[in-house]
Regions:
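Structured adenosyl-cofactor binding patch, chiefly the S-adenosyl-L-methionine
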Residues: 112, 116-160
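General small-molecule cofactor/ligand-binding pocket signal
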Residues: 7, 35-37
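Short, well-ordered alpha-helix to beta-strand connector turns
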Residues: 32, 71-72, 122
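S-adenosyl-L-methionine/SAH cofactor-binding core of RNA-modifying enzymes
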Residues: 40-102
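Loop/turn-to-beta-strand initiation segments
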Residues: 3, 101-107
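A generic structural motif
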Residues: 29-35
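N-terminal beta1-alpha1 ligand-phosphate binding loop
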Residues: 1-28
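Short glycine-rich anion-binding loops that position phosphate/pyrophosphate groups of nucleotides
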Residues: 12, 79-82, 110-113
Length: 160
């Protein structure tokens, strides 16, 4: 069974997001071993400078590096990443598995995104949309798409 790690910078605060995450954890349990890791987001003032943002992203990246699972494939969620359909994501996940990646790690950055050096280490940069979403919602959307990807692979009727 493949292991999926979703590593997020920032914690869920609203109960409705937590409920949605729990629902997708339940759905995914038949397809993979899911691990959700949350790391603290660096606190910045209301109008941080570019230098302050870069410094915060570097600090967050250092924490991420400590928690990244060894081996497997790293998928960085970022707006400039590749957009793909649900079917294409399912195929990409299958390709990673066929190449021996028994573990996939999806990385969701803080509200300021991800450090550039961290993105360069990713095997895939993935974008959900050119639109901007709250990171808490992005987590739910990612879990839904991972669930859908497994169901596409299994040939269930969920995906239409």
């Amino acid at each position: 069974m493949q292991k999926i790690t979703v590593l997020c910078v920032g914690k869920l605060k609203e109960a409705f997001y937590e409920q949605a995450v729990k629902e997708y954890e339940k759905r995914l349990s038949r397809y993979c071993k899911l691990e959700l890791l949350e790391l603290p987001e660096q606190r910045l003032g209301d109008e941080p400078s570019e230098a302050e943002i870069r410094q915060a992203l570097k600090k967050e990246a250092a924490l991420v590096e400590q928690k990244l699972p060894k081996g497997g494939a790293l998928i960085a969620m970022c707006i400039e990443g590749q957009e793909m359909s649900s079917v294409a994501l399912s195929e990409k996940m299958q390709q990673f598995a066929a190449r021996g990646a028994s573990q996939l790690t999806f990385l969701i950055g803080s509200s300021f995104g991800l450090d550039e050096d961290l993105k360069k280490k990713a095997d895939l940069r993935l974008s959900m949309s050119p639109m901007t979403f709250p990171h808490h919602l992005a987590r739910v959307m990612l879990l839904e798409q991972v669930s859908r990807a497994y169901q596409i692979e299994a040939g269930t009727k969920y995906h239409k």
